[in-house]
Amino acid sequence: MQMAQVPALSPDGAGRPIDLDAARALLAPLSAQERLSWAQNTFGAGFALTTSFGIQSAVLLHMASELTAITGRPIPVVWVDTGYLPRETYQYAERLVEQLQLQLVVAQSAMSPARMEALHGRLWETDQPGDLALYHRIRKVEPLDRALTDLAVTCWASGVRGSQTDHRKAMEPLDAVRQRWSLRPLLSWSKRDVYYYMEEHKLPQHPLFEQGYSTVGDWHSSAPDLGDVSGRATRFGGLQQECGIHLPGLMGEGI
């Protein structure tokens, strides 16, 4: 049986190893809410959520908010603000933070957008995979990893779904990513599941949803669905669908 090397922290702070195979077997039949509850009970103060405040982000944030109401233990929500998000995303974030009473932690690159462009140019315009990898490392992966380190996070949950990309289709509910546990409560959810959950709980849609966007990231690399091109295939003109945050390599290696 595989024994993972990343330590888990119990609620009282005592370190203990996680048996990855056993944890996956335990998580497989659980609902998304039950997976979140398991993670909070297992990792205690070392558990956090990440969010992009994108089209489907409200679902996991709402679940975390409801769990906090039950347990009385707020879950930190880490948001990577690249400095290039659409105005609508910033407005949507403010609305959800207020409505769901989120404990928000904003992570930003130590390098301002202006400085990055002065030193490296507009990396998203070159259509070069290496430039996109550098962009994602500077603006997304490094800020996230720094924030998780500052918060002493040992497990973070995200809203990735298996149907979004080929890479995500092969994911497990729990994996080790860059020396931390990565939990995917919504991995088996469909777009329909997301939509009906938001309708049932009267969660607001991202303003760009009504303009035909099924996913939204930075303003310069997101587009509404068009014909056969939809979802994350609209990112960076279809050149790249993963930003490195959910990839196992150090600081986005292999993006």
Stretches found by the model and what they are:
Residues 2-255:
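Nucleotide-activated chemistry modules centered on ATP-dependent adenylation/adenylyltransferase
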